């Protein structure tokens, strides 16, 4: 596992965007051989999406031959609801880059058969081989996507019940009213995520400090699904200073020295 310790959340966004752009450019994608990118929603990746849009506008990266898969979607709200993850992705990213509509893959939270929809999504991912790079965030309780505490670390895409903590955290997007926050979501599984060639998780803010500690210094534990990153051969966590407050000083020092040349300029 790599840990990229930066000072601010803005730096996390810029580092992550530069990393994604480099991966895409090094891959040299074509229509027949697209780069497959996994994407999250929420507050944490907004800085990354903003930085990626800037890189696109500067001509430093193209998404024409990039295929995307999103992590999750709420069940029971319309696709055009302002807080659906479809709306989030188009408003904050897709509408501002050159991605082709047919290359955008999103879970349908209003599908009549949720199990069939989840299997369709898994099959679609497999049709591309695997996801080249999956970017994600992490919840205060260490959940990745909507794989809440005690989720199976070999789980696949499925419907999940959201914990009250998650609904409270997400109520900030619903006028602070938890009753407006859906109780269920479709989400990729931890196993789905681990199938990716590379995983990059963004961690910002002091409220994520315990989750970061569990991911880096804790044992692999289904109560902290982010800890499953320890099982992956190519995972990277990009974090800001406030999120590292629960880590041992020597841990932060170790990774700061190890990644020194990769942090320069950010």
UniProtKB/Swiss-Prot annotation:
Task: Please state the Enzyme Commission number of this protein.
Answer: 3.5.99.6
Q: Which InterPro entries does this UniProt record tie to the protein?
A: Glc/Gal-6P_isomerase, Glucosamine6P_isomerase, Glucosamine6P_isomerase_CS, NagB/RpiA_transferase-like
Which PROSITE patterns has this protein been placed in? GLC_GALNAC_ISOMERASE
Its pathway is: Amino-sugar metabolism; N-acetylneuraminate degradation; D-fructose 6-phosphate from N-acetylneuraminate: step 5/5
Q: How is its activity regulated?
A: Allosterically activated by N-acetylglucosamine 6-phosphate (GlcNAc6P).
Report which superkingdom the organism of origin falls in. Bacteria
**What positions does UniProt annotate as the active site of this protein?**
72 (proton acceptor), 141 (for ring-opening step), 143 (proton acceptor), 148 (for ring-opening step)
Q: Name one GO biological process term.
A: carbohydrate metabolic process
The alphabetical list of record keywords is: Allosteric enzyme, Carbohydrate metabolism, Hydrolase
The record's Pfam families line, in alphabetical order, gives: Glucosamine_iso
The molecular function terms in GO held by this entry are:
glucosamine-6-phosphate deaminase activity; identical protein binding
Does the record carry Hydrolase as a key word? yes
GO CC terms, sorted: cytoplasm
Q: Which CDD domains match?
A: GlcN6P_deaminase
- Asked if the keyword Transport belongs to this entry, the reply reads no
Residues carrying the site annotation Part of the allosteric site? 151, 158, 160-161, 254
Per the entry, what this protein does is: Catalyzes the reversible isomerization-deamination of glucosamine 6-phosphate (GlcN6P) to form fructose 6-phosphate (Fru6P) and ammonium ion.
Summarize subunit and interaction data from the UniProt record for this chain: Homohexamer.
Family in the record: Belongs to the glucosamine/galactosamine-6-phosphate isomerase family. NagB subfamily.
Q: What is this protein called?
A: Glucosamine-6-phosphate deaminase
């Amino acid at each position: 596992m790599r840990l990229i310790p930066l000072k601010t959340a803005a730096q996390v966004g810029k580092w992550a965007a530069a990393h994604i752009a480099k991966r895409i450019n090094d891959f040299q994608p074509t229509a027949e051989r697209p780069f497959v990118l996994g994407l999250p929603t929420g507050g944490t990746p907004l800085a990354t999406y903003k930085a990626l849009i800037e890189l696109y506008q500067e001509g430093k990266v193209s998404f024409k031959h990039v295929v995307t898969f999103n992590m999750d979607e709420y069940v029971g709200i319309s696709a055009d609801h302002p807080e659906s993850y479809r709306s989030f992705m188009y408003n904050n990213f897709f509408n501002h880059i050159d991605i082709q509509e047919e290359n955008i893959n999103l879970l349908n939270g209003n599908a009549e058969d949720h199990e069939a929809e989840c299997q369709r999504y898994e099959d679609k991912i497999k049709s591309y081989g695997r996801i080249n790079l999956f970017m994600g965030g992490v919840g205060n309780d260490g959940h990745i996507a909507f794989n809440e505490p005690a989720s199976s670390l070999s789980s696949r895409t499925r419907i999940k019940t959201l914990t009250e903590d998650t609904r409270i955290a997400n109520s900030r997007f619903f006028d602070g009213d938890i009753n407006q926050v859906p109780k269920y979501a479709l989400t990729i599984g931890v196993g789905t995520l681990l199938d990716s060639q590379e995983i990059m998780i963004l961690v910002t803010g002091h409220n994520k400090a315990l989750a970061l500690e569990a991911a880096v210094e804790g044992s692999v534990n289904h109560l902290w699904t982010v800890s499953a990153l320890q099982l992956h051969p190519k995972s990277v966590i990009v974090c800001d200073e406030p999120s590292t407050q629960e880590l041992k000083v020597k841990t932060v020092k170790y990774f700061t020295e190890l990644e020194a040349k990769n942090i320069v300029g950010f």
